[in-house]
Amino acid sequence: MKDKKIKVFYAVQVSNFTFVDGKPKWLLRNDACTNIAIGIISTILKRYPDQFKFLVKLPAAFDTIDVLHLEDLFKPEFHKDIEFLIDDIPHSPVTSRYHFDMQRYLNDPQYLKTFEDVDVMINDENTLTKNWRVLFNEWKLSIPIISTNYFLDSPIANKVPERIRYYERQMESFIASDIAAFQCEAGRVEAMEAYDILFKSRDILAPQSVWGVGAHYAEIEEYHTDKKFEIPTIYFGNRISDTANRYTNYDTFAEAIGILSTITDKPFRAVMLNPTRKATPEQLELINTLSKHQVEVMSNSEKFTRADYLTFINKSHIACNLFVTEVHGGVTHCEAMMAKNILVMPRVNNYLHKMLKAGHADYPYFTKIDQDQPHKPDARDVAMKIKEALDSIGTLKETEIRELCHDIGYKHESYESACDRIVNDIHTLVFPILNHKN
């Protein structure tokens, strides 16, 4: 290891925002990519003390509703090795993915000075990989780029309208990067299938790496408790969103709870966490109708801190994560597993892949896909699996499944398990450059 610390520039893809008095504000503590970045950075700094420092690109704290100082996102022990690059990005998961102010960086010499000692970049904004590459080239800086790929938009699994899709930019990032990093193997496979639609050859691709990152186990472990809610609690932690044919399938959860209410006599509480705090009256009416008024939706104005969330999931019994077209399955399912929830999920993609790797293809709470709507789980089967999970509460089976989810979640989705793989990728890119300079 060289004497000076390796400096990592980490550009975070921020997409979670809400409205306050009609004006948009970022929700960093509930943002998936922000929490992934916090977890990766914290884990690396803890495991490799005095070897790394980070320059983290985020919007300003005053442009959020849940952060007073960006430093507060990290534990005090890490503050000395973290600095921030403030970026005034549009409040939108779409327009922010295309925003890049090249002139800003070129006109102010302070930016060049900031980047001169950067050794490597981790880029969550994979639609902007080529932009960063061009900027570094203009500055005559040899900064290798690891582009992460957490949210694929492609003809296989479209997320936004075709004319503004991220697809071509994301495919370009596989070429413009030095390493293309994927959250899970299922995501890598889907990305390569999408790439083959656009390009004839894979020879120009950057090397690929599967990190296996989903959640920060140390953070979740702090809130572990054996004391569960008195009433068995089932929750849906993903967005209430109509994007991409309701790709989070919040409506399926509501429908399943409505069915559940007719087939069980056991008490239960069903909650939708509404993390973006943007549920519309129309969405709430749909949820009420489908669920037969059996689902509580956290209100847009209800305060729910990161600590509140971690306390809630650790005291809950059953988590439903119902992604079909988003292959990783969402950060919330990883957090649910590590919190020892019984996880109800479709038998597809990363949900299935990690269970297969762990030797549990027969996981009892996998759900079927709707035969008429292949992008959605079957609501009746979801209801049946929730009922079976409810029936298991207080039995040996509940304990066994909770421990199984916990152990598989840690092994296949924790930053702690992924840390050495990530650091190895950084070393692979940085050491040859440092050796050449020396």
Regions found by a protein language model. Give the residues of each.
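A charged, aromatic-enriched C-terminal amphipathic alpha-helix characteristic of glycosyltransferases
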Residues: 373-377, 394-431
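A short, active-site helix/loop in glycosyltransferases that binds the activated sugar's phosphate group
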Residues: 164, 168-205
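Acidic donor-binding loop of glycosyltransferase active sites
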Residues: 117-120, 311-328
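Nucleotide-activated donor-binding/catalytic signature segment of Leloir-type glycosyltransferases, i.e.
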Residues: 281-307
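N-terminal subdomain of nucleotide-sugar transferases
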Residues: 1-68, 116, 262
